């Protein structure tokens, strides 16, 4: 019996190999409960993956299509929604995942090698951790303050 998945693979390979941890996470923006998949993607550090006409699509599962101009227009909106969400954390794709901490039943923190932290809140209510407010069913990305470099110090 599984109580909770932990991103072991991502802790080893994130920053080296792109990943989508579960088949159910393809075309997530087309799913009715996309918020849950979107949060899992943020927690596991994966990028969105979209496929047209996948043979693995089961009847009755939501999917994206491009058979008509209307379907294409709708699917482009779905893909754009996923890309916009990923833009919030896309800079982390080249950094190693250093830590994954379960802070509570519905709150997790993923820490990256550049010091960035992603707080994911699966709860229906806002939560706070480490002084970071995370809205209900959302995530927050906290990036470290930029450190001065030798070249920036010379410019002063």
Question: How would you name each of these model-derived features?
Answer:
Residues 1-155:
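Active-site-proximal substrate-binding groove within the catalytic cores of carbohydrate-active enzymes
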């Amino acid at each position: 019996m599984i109580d909770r998945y932990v991103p072991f693979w991502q802790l080893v390979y994130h920053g080296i190999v792109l990943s989508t941890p579960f088949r159910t996470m393809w075309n997530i923006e087309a799913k009715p409960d996309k918020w849950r998949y979107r949060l899992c993607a943020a927690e596991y550090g994966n990028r969105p993956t979209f496929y047209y006409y996948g043979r693995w699509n089961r009847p009755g599962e939501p999917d994206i299509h491009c058979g008509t101009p209307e379907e294409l227009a709708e699917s482009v909106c779905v893909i754009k929604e996923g890309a916009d969400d990923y833009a919030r954390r896309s800079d982390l794709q080249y950094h190693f995942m250093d830590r994954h901490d379960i802070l509570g039943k519905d709150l997790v923190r993923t820490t990256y090698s550049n010091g960035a932290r992603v707080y994911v809140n699966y709860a229906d209510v806002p939560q706070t951790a480490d002084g970071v407010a995370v809205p209900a069913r959302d995530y927050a990305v906290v990036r470290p303050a930029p450190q001065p470099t030798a070249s920036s110090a010379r410019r002063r």
